[in-house]
Swiss-Prot record:
It comes from Ralstonia nicotianae (strain ATCC BAA-1114 / GMI1000) (Ralstonia solanacearum). This is SsrA-binding protein. The gene is smpB. Required for rescue of stalled ribosomes mediated by trans-translation. Binds to transfer-messenger RNA (tmRNA), required for stable association of tmRNA with ribosomes. tmRNA and SmpB together mimic tRNA shape, replacing the anticodon stem-loop with SmpB. tmRNA is encoded by the ssrA gene; the 2 termini fold to resemble tRNA(Ala) and it encodes a 'tag peptide', a short internal open reading frame. During trans-translation Ala-aminoacylated tmRNA acts like a tRNA, entering the A-site of stalled ribosomes, displacing the stalled mRNA. It comes from the Bacteria. Residues 129-148 are annotated as: Disordered.
């Protein structure tokens, strides 16, 4: 079940490969995510010391969050992947033009997972082409409905 999608990622990047990663979360973050108070549109993934981190994802704390814990909505969160997957991603990201972007948050067997994509940035003309294709698909569907 999907919690949050990053629709902007598909507009700004060509996503070539997808990986499912676990996220190291605190208790208040899990509760807030279950309440749907998460946004990953501004998030991105960085590699530091052979580890992946999700930066810029915003999880709004609930009013009932603990008083002895100071919730930080945009803290850096560690992503959990197998070592060989991380090595593969490091090799790809070091190539020119590749980056890692969060695509969505979802539940897998009761755990919150983050799907990350190995992506290449789109140029402005690529974005325009994508928009034209989407508009044409919408127009085509409308015409087919009118015929039927």
């Amino acid at each position: 079940m999907t919690i949050a999608d990053n629709k902007k990622a598909f507009f700004d990047y060509f996503v070539e490969e997808r990986y499912e990663a676990g996220i190291a979360l605190e208790g208040w973050e899990v509760k807030a995510i279950r309440a749907g108070r998460v946004q990953i549109k501004e998030g991105y993934v960085v590699i530091r010391d052979a580890e992946l981190f999700l930066i810029g994802a915003h999880i709004s704390p609930l009013q009932s969050a603990s008083t002895h814990v100071k919730p930080d909505p945009t803290r850096t969160r560690k992503l959990l992947l197998h070592a060989e997957e991380i090595k593969k991603l490091i090799g790809k990201v070091e190539q020119r033009g590749y980056t890692l972007v969060p695509l969505n948050l979802h539940y897998a067997r009761g755990r919150v997972k983050c799907e990350i994509g190995l992506a290449k940035g789109k140029k402005l003309y690529d974005k325009r082409e994508t928009e034209k294709d989407r508009d044409w698909q919408r127009e085509k569907a409308r015409l087919m409905r009118e015929k039927a």
